[in-house]
């Protein structure tokens, strides 16, 4: 039974305007358009009137917009037929938690109603639907009733076989094409031989499983191959050269090359988590660091948002599935694409070269892909703190003569760090009889063949196979799974997880064989035990689909009840689908058809398949020098500042949460003006320590068009110069991930790959003492297609991306690029590791003038590079550096400009001592760094540089000036004289243009104007209370602690830092899941206070916090329990972010809240992660007692934080009753509605409210993430351990006596 509920208008005015702009570009005869949400309820039986009203109320969410009666021709966009959207999964969960159990499934679509001034042609109709839906993720039907196709169920399909006993090689070769297996000829021979020996035909499931498990993507055949180059056999494989770094420098590495991530030694700190009694406590223990970096290039090319989202999601699962369970902590994301070609923003280096229709454009990838990666990290609850973005697309004379090189097949990099207990670093043994479990979401017919598909050059696979390999993301489900893993590893020696892997490429067909094989066992499985959302799937589709957010585990039978209880509490789906066997055989039984889709010896599936031999020839390049004759410095700088690799990247940063965990010490944004120029990311190891972790990225991929080895060396070196200004100590503490992207088989590239791997694996890294314990390769970076009868291709440069990871001794000592004006007289020094060579080949300067040049930068002297790192470490330890920024893309002139942008100051520079060629001096990208040093410290700094052999490379540049001017001279000749604010505006143009295309253009314009304002004062802080006064001391000395419920729902992700803040204030912080209240394991009558934590309950489906609130309001027992708690006179309640949204939806049961508004989508219509300033007002709130008149920065991370009132009188009443506890203010300290000082557009900057008796408070920003000073992106130097917001938690402790 299907019931359709109309929803609110789906598009805001500016979204409609954007849509109409596209229609106008296509010359479509559209007079009007109206779009509204439709909700489709698939019911087991008819609803009662009460149930119908409840469901209607549940489906009422979002900003209030005036609906209209639809008219015109209807086009309904629904989830792709045959799939179940992640929205549906979460909305259905909410319905069931509201006791609406007749709802089998909820889905959502958008109905578009168009009025035309004439009938559309078939081509015009295609243009129209292309503007309103994504064919990879959605379908179009022509009426709401036709959406019933979403809920059709089909009978299960049987497996098929390939008749090789009769047809031999020919039959398998045909199946290789139709199934998209990407099998090589020797693999076909291998399979025919083995199945002939078994005396039977292979099933399609077995072939698909073999193809995925043995794809280049999964088995890394090229990196394990034997090599012959120019007729000479090479001694080592690529992988052996990488492993050489570990053989030479095994120091501090605990696990390498054998798990989902590598592990290195960390610090002994207090890890904070709840014990089995539910109380959060610190646990002093060795907390090691895990690291992993993946790529997800093919899916991102086909469908950017889910491709990038599942790229981040898969890498997060890799971290969680390390050892016997670990905790992901902080992430990185990177993109390489072809030229953007932004409409109305043409750049002189861009040509509108063509592309195949099946892949997304570079612009679409950079609009949708970053949103996907950010959305997954945000919803999972992992801060994304680091990244890179490069564009390249040019016809160049390289190793094969003139050809187009670029990133039509993009690079989507996803990586990060996590933590793991010492006892869980190594995986356990799998005993015979161990239960084999799939943890996570149900199987769906999506993401088929991703491993094999990503192993082909783009264009080799059929478009329908590309379509099938697109995946779907549900980060809230992955968060639930991670909570299960966390509960398990937190049990220490009682951890029920013996073995764990994530489910990625190839689905269960790769994950389960890998699990049992690594555990030395076989496995017997029952197909129909696998959770499935689509009953008509074939065995191949069930076993091989790549439905995301899944893990496979081995659990001993006696620990199974414990594991089940943990899963049920976290509402994480799981299924016991088999058990480990002594016999090395993989058997998959199908009880529905009473047959075995798989019955295969493990040694055939994962045995000695034929080893690849790469017999290749090297190539040389002979390119002319960079023609400098027509290049002027000012115009060159303007161009370079607009080049995406150099330009400001705020549009990629503020979409990502950078404060969740409460352990972020250095994000991308630097200083009071929050300028995105940080060289590295830094986290604290725990919530009670200054030890930590750092990570950085190095990449110089265009250099590979001239010199493969130099490109690899520079990537390693840049990762070091980026991380050098944090307190690491021994360079051997740094561990690298190497991600290799190449167009294998393209002339010269294979030999170039070998040359690059050798350059760092055999030479540079061993010489520096660096280890590469982890990495990934993608060997199909070429796009080919037919166009008007011609064969076309675009080939990516050989691309090595290096990510560096290190333990940090003291995170407070990290030095940023922000030039300081508050430290007296100072000097700027350049440490030139290029030794004056000033080479310009493959630089940003060359790129913006559509050239390549001849000789690129390179590592000149390895010992000096090592000496440079050691010198910086000494200066960091001694706190002799005021600012530090490495030289990279754009050269010295960009390094200096970015430092001035961060410091909101001017500079006066003389380059006389740096060489004779002005362009070479200013725009070369040789290794090096600029440091700012106090004049009084110059002698001591020079002594350190002398000690490390660098003094002859150190040149004094000039001074910092307290004005809005950047001046560069050669002695008395002025080379550049320009306002800093003008250059700052040019640097920001790319972000401005991308934000206008993607977000609310009014908001984009407001932020752009703010960046150019020389009078912007940036962030500041003024406190009306003593930050260091221990106001809770008298109460803590009593020896009793009030109990606070740290309340969370599925998808909440900020509970650890919240608990830590209350624990520090003197509370017993107790972990309380909503399922505990539902099942009676906890009751609110046992608590003195509750806090509803931030995150994404139910993934913000049905309105942020709305589903959580309605699961309380529509459950009589829970409603009564919460109402009783709020009406007690001895309790306190706080709601932060998602908890704020939730409590605002509970206002009807909270006394004194009749004028509260509710929180809806931000004005920008984008998730906003910012550091904003707020002012505390004078109210009755006990939470803000003594803080009135203060203003200070605070972390903001939300997508729905704009307050909306039913009527204006509510706002006036709040003001009259003094219930507005805090407001966003601008740099002039006035309440503001201007973006981004007000990140969500709330009226009068409202961001916190109190109820009338002062005991309940709600606020959208996150005080719990910045209760320690060190976790503020910027804070005054006189702040010590506690941050300004610790007082809020202390006030609560005082209020309870």
From Swiss-Prot:
Tell me the SMART domains matching this sequence: GATase_5
The record's section on PROSITE patterns has: GATASE_TYPE_1
What this protein is called in its record is Phosphoribosylformylglycinamidine synthase
Q: Which organism is it from?
A: Histophilus somni (strain 129Pt)
**Per the record's keyword annotation, is Magnesium included, yes or no?**
yes
Q: Which GO terms describe its cellular component?
A: cytoplasm
Alphabetized GO MF terms: ATP binding; metal ion binding; phosphoribosylformylglycinamidine synthase activity
The keyword Ligase is annotated on this UniProt entry: yes
The annotated pathway is:
Purine metabolism; IMP biosynthesis via de novo pathway; 5-amino-1-(5-phospho-D-ribosyl)imidazole from N(2)-formyl-N(1)-(5-phospho-D-ribosyl)glycinamide: step 1/2
């Amino acid at each position: 039974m299907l019931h359709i509920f109309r929803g609110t208008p789906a598009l805001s005015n500016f979204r409609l305007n954007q849509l109409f702009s596209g229609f106008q570009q296509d010359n479509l005869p559209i007079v009007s358009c109206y779009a509204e949400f439709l909700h489709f309820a698939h019911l087991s039986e008819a609803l009662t009137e009460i149930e119908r009203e409840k469901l209607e109320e549940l489906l009422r969410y979002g900003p209030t917009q005036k609906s209209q009666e639809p008219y015109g021709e209807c086009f309904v966009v629904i989830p792709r037929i045959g799939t179940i959207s992640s929205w549906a999964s979460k909305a259905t969960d909410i319905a069931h938690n509201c006791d609406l159990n007749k709802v089998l499934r909820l889905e959502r679509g958008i109905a578009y109603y168009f009025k035309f001034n004439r009938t559309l042609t078939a081509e015009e109709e295609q243009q129209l639907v292309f503007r309103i839906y994504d064919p990879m993720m959605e379908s179009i039907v022509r009426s709401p009733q036709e959406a019933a196709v979403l809920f059709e169920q089909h009978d299960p399909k049987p497996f098929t076989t390939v008749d090789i006993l009769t047809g031999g090689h020919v039959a398998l070769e045909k199946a290789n094409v139709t199934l998209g297996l990407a099998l090589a000829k020797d693999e076909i021979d291998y399979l025919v031989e083995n199945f002939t020996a078994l005396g039977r035909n292979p099933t399609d499931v077995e072939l698909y499983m073999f193809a995925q498990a043995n794809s280049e993507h999964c088995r890394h055949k090229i990196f394990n191959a034997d090599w012959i180059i120019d007729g000479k056999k090479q001694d080592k494989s690529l992988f052996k050269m990488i492993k050489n770094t570990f053989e030479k420098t095994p120091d501090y590495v605990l696990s390498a090359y054998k798990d989902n991530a590598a592990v290195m030694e960390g610090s002994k700190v207090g890890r904070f988590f709840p014990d089995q009694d539910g109380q959060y406590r610190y646990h002093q223990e060795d907390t090691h660091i895990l690291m992993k970096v993946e790529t997800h290039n093919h899916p991102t090319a086909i469908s950017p948002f889910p491709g990038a989202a599942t790229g981040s999601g898969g890498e997060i699962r890799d971290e969680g599935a390390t050892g016997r369970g670990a905790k992901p902590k902080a992430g990185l994301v990177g993109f390489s694409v072809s030229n953007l070609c932004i409409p109305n923003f043409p750049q002189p280096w861009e040509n509108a070269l063509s592309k195949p229709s099946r892949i997304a454009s570079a612009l679409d990838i950079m609009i949708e892909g970053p949103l996907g990666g950010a959305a997954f990290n945000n919803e999972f609850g992992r801060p994304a703190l680091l990244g890179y973005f490069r564009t390249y697309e040019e016809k160049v004379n390289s190793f094969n003569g003139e050809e187009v090189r670029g990133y039509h097949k993009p690079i989507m990099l996803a990586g990060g760090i996590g933590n793991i207990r010492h006892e869980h670093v190594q995986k356990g043994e799998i005993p015979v009889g161990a239960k084999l479990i799939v943890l996570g979401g149900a199987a769906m017919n999506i993401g088929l063949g991703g491993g094999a598909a990503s192993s082909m050059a783009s264009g080799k696979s059929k478009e329908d196979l590309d379509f099938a390999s697109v995946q779907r993301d549900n980060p809230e489900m992955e968060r639930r799974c991670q909570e299960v893993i966390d509960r398990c590893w937190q049990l220490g020696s009682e951890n029920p997880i013996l073995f764990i892997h994530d489910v990625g490429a190839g689905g269960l067909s790769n994950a389960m064989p890998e699990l049992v094989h690594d555990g030395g066992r076989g496995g017997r499985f029952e197909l129909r035990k696998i959770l499935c959302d689509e009953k008509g799937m074939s065995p191949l589709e069930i076993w091989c689909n790549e439905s995301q957010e899944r893990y496979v585990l081995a659990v001993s039978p006696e620990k199974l009840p414990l594991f089940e209880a943990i899963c049920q509490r976290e509402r994480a789906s799981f299924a016991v689908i088999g058990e480990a066997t002594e016999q090395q055989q993989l058997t998959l039984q199908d009880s529905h058809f009473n047959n075995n889709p798989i019955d295969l010896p493990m040694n055939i599936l994962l045995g000695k398949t034929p080893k690849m031999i790469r017999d290749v020839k090297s190539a040389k390049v002979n390119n002319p020098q960079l023609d400098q004759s027509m290049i002027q410095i000012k115009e060159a700088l303007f161009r370079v500042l607009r080049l995406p690799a150099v330009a400001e990247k705020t549009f990629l940063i503020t979409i990502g949460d950078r404060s969740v965990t409460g352990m972020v010490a250095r994000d991308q944004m630097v200083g009071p003006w929050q300028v995105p120029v940080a060289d590295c990311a830094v986290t604290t190891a725990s919530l009670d320590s200054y030890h930590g972790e750092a990570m950085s990225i190095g990449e110089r991929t265009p250099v590979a068009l001239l010199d493969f080895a130099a490109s690899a060396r520079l990537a390693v070196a840049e990762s070091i110069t980026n991380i050098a200004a944090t307190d690491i100590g021994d360079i051997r503490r740094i561990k690298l991930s190497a991600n290799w992207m190449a167009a294998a088989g393209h002339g010269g590239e294979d030999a170039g790959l070998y040359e690059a791997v050798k350059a760092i694996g055999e030479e540079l890294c061993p010489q520096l003492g660096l280890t590469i314990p982890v990495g990934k390769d993608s060997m199909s970076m070429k796009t080919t297609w037919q166009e008007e009868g011609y064969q076309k291709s675009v080939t990516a440069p050989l691309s090595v991306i290096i990510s560096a990871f290190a333990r940090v001794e003291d995170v407070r000592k990290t030095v940023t690029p922000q030039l300081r004006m508050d430290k007296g007289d100072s000097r700027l020094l350049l440490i030139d590791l290029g030794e004056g060579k000033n080479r310009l080949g493959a630089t940003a300067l060359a790129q913006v003038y559509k050239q390549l040049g001849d000789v690129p930068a390179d590592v000149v002297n390895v010992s000096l590079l090592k000496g440079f790192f050691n010198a910086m470490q000494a200066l960091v330890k001694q706190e002799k550096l005021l600012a530090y920024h490495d030289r990279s893309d754009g050269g010295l002139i960009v390094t200096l400009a970015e430092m001035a942008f961060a410091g909101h100051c001017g500079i006066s520079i003389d380059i006389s001592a740096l060489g004779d060629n002005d362009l070479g001096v200013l725009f070369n990208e040789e290794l090096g760094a600029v440091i700012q040093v106090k004049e009084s410290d110059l002698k001591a700094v020079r002594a350190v540089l002398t000690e490390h052999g660098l003094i002859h490379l150190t040149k004094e540049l000039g001074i910092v000036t307290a004005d809005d001017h950047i001046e560069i001279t050669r002695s008395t000749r002025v080379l550049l004289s320009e306002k800093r604010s003008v250059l700052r505006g040019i640097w920001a143009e790319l972000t401005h243009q991308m934000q206008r295309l993607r977000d609310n253009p009014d908001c984009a314009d407001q932020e752009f104007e703010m960046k150019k304002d020389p009078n912007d004062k940036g962030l500041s802080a003024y406190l009306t209370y003593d930050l260091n006064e221990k106001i809770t001391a008298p109460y803590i000395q009593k020896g009793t602690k009030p109990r606070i419920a740290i309340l969370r729902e599925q998808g909440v992700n900020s509970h650890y830092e919240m608990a830590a803040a209350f624990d520090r204030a003197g509370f017993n912080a107790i972990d309380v899941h909503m399922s505990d209240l539902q099942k009676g394991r906890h009751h609110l009558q046992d608590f003195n206070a509750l806090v509803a934590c931030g995150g994404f309950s139910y993934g913000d489906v049905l309105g942020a916090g709305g589903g959580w609130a309605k699961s309380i309001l529509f459950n009589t027992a829970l409603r009564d329990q919460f109402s009783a708690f709020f009406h007690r006179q001895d309790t306190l309640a706080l709601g932060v972010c998602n908890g704020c949204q939730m409590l605002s939806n509970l206002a009807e049961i909270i006394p004194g809240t009749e004028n509260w508004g509710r929180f809806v989508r931000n004005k920008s219509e984008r998730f906003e992660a910012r550091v904003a300033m707020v002012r505390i007002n004078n109210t009755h709130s006990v939470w803000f007692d003594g803080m009135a008149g203060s203003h200070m920065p605070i972390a903001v991370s939300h997508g729905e934080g704009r307050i909306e009132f039913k009527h204006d009188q509510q706002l006036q009443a709040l003001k009259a009753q003094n219930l507005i506890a805090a407001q966003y203010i601008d740099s002039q300290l006035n309440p503001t509605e201007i973006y981004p000082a007000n990140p969500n557009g709330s009226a009068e900057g409202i961001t916190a409210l109190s109820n009338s008796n002062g005991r309940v408070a709600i606020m959208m920003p996150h005080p719990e993430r910045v209760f320690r000073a060190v976790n503020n992106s910027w804070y005054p130097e006189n702040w010590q351990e506690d941050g300004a917001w610790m007082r809020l938690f202390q006030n609560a402790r005082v209020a309870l006596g």
